[in-house]
């Protein structure tokens, strides 16, 4: 029997999730339909319930509905509660279950695909929005030596320090506060990689870093990664691997087992070239 899944968002035409999940299905021999589901901005819950009525088993949730998905969920995992956001909905036994796989996707990409250890490292996350909030708890679970969140508006970073205190120690900073500091892993969680606007970071901040990582992805280097290259950072990576790994975690939640992500990453990279 073919099961029905989808990715929901607004807009949604750009989503690579159908390609990724169909590739996973091809690996495992599992029959499934996976759609793109465009929801009106003011009609998320109605669209979800209509999908459930069609026999839908699960949804991946993208912008701008991750907070609404959290509010709609009758049961939340710890990582979803920490993030205050849900990107994976499962419809089981009449209940809507919410999870967030973004953070574990990032961790797996860094640790498994890039072979970079997080434990004992000095981490810097740029930005204090939903992308950073979604990955902090899984990063803290890796026991870095330190984790600093830097943001243009320092009070937003300080709010994350308070919220995540139960999961580990987080430091807050403004971009100017980073002058003279060194970090092993620097992760961009802002949207500047999409807009092309440069972050007002101190010159040379990325020079001594083992890994410079941008959560966004696309053709070639993002502006942030180009800066890392110019400052001679050790390794550069965009967020394509994170995208595939968070999808693999959703697959595991829905179907069990773990698909082989490497060939899917390679195929997706070719599609985007």
From Swiss-Prot:
Catalytic residues in the record: 66 (proton acceptor)
Binding site residues for NADP(+): 78, 127-131, 151-156, 215, 239
One Pfam family recorded for the sequence: SDH_C
UniProt GO molecular function: NADP binding; shikimate 3-dehydrogenase (NADP+) activity
GO biological process, one term: shikimate metabolic process
One GO cellular component term: cytosol
Keywords: Amino-acid biosynthesis, Aromatic amino acid biosynthesis, NADP, Oxidoreductase
The protein's annotated pathway: Metabolic intermediate biosynthesis; chorismate biosynthesis; chorismate from D-erythrose 4-phosphate and phosphoenolpyruvate: step 4/7
Stored InterPro entries: Aminoacid_DH-like_N_sf, NAD(P)-bd_dom_sf, SDH_C, Shikimate_DH, Shikimate_DH-bd_N, Shikimate_DH_fam, Shikm_DH/Glu-tRNA_Rdtase
Catalyzed reactions: shikimate + NADP(+) = 3-dehydroshikimate + NADPH + H(+)
EC number(s) from the headed UniProt entry: 1.1.1.25
Name of the top EC class for this enzyme: oxidoreductase
Keyword Ribonucleoprotein: no
NCBIfam families: aroE, PRK00258.1-2
Record note on quaternary structure: Homodimer.
PANTHER family: BIFUNCTIONAL 3-DEHYDROQUINATE DEHYDRATASE_SHIKIMATE DEHYDROGENASE, CHLOROPLASTIC, SHIKIMATE DEHYDROGENASE
Protein family per UniProt: Belongs to the shikimate dehydrogenase family.
Function: Involved in the biosynthesis of the chorismate, which leads to the biosynthesis of aromatic amino acids. Catalyzes the reversible NADPH linked reduction of 3-dehydroshikimate (DHSA) to yield shikimate (SA).
Entry protein name: Shikimate dehydrogenase (NADP(+))
Taxonomic lineage from the root: Bacteria, Pseudomonadati, Pseudomonadota, Betaproteobacteria, Neisseriales
């Amino acid at each position: 029997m073919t099961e029905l899944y989808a990715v929901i968002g607004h807009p949604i035409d750009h989503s690579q999730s159908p390609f990724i999940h169909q590739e996973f299905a091809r690996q495992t021999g599992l029959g499934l339909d996976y759609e793109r589901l465009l929801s009106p901005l003011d009609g998320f819950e109605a669209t979800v319930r209509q999908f459930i009525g069609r026999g839908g088993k699960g949804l991946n949730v993208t912008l701008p509905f991750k907070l609404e998905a959290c509010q709609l969920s009758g049961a939340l995992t710890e990582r979803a509660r920490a993030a205050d956001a849900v990107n994976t909905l499962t419809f089981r036994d009449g209940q809507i279950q919410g999870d967030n796989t973004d953070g574990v996707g990032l961790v797996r990409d860094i640790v498994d695909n890039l072979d970079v250890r997080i434990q004992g490292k000095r981490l810097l996350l740029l930005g204090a929005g939903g992308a950073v909030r979604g990955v902090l708890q899984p990063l803290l679970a890796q026991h870095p030596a330190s984790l600093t969140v830097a943001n243009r508006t320092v009070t937003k970073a300080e709010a994350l320090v308070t919220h995540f205190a139960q999961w580990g120690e987080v430091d807050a900073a403004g971009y100017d506060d980073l002058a003279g500091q060194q970090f092993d892993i620097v992760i961009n969680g802002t949207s500047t990689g999409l807009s092309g606007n440069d972050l007002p970071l101190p010159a040379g901040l990325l020079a001594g870093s083992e890994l410079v990582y941008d959560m966004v992805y696309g053709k070639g280097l993002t502006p942030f990664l180009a800066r890392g290259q110019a400052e001679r950072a050790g390794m550069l990576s965009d967020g394509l691997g994170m995208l595939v790994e968070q999808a693999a975690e959703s697959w595991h939640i829905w179907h069990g087992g773990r698909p082989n992500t490497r060939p899917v990453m390679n195929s997706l990279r070719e599609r985007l070239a």
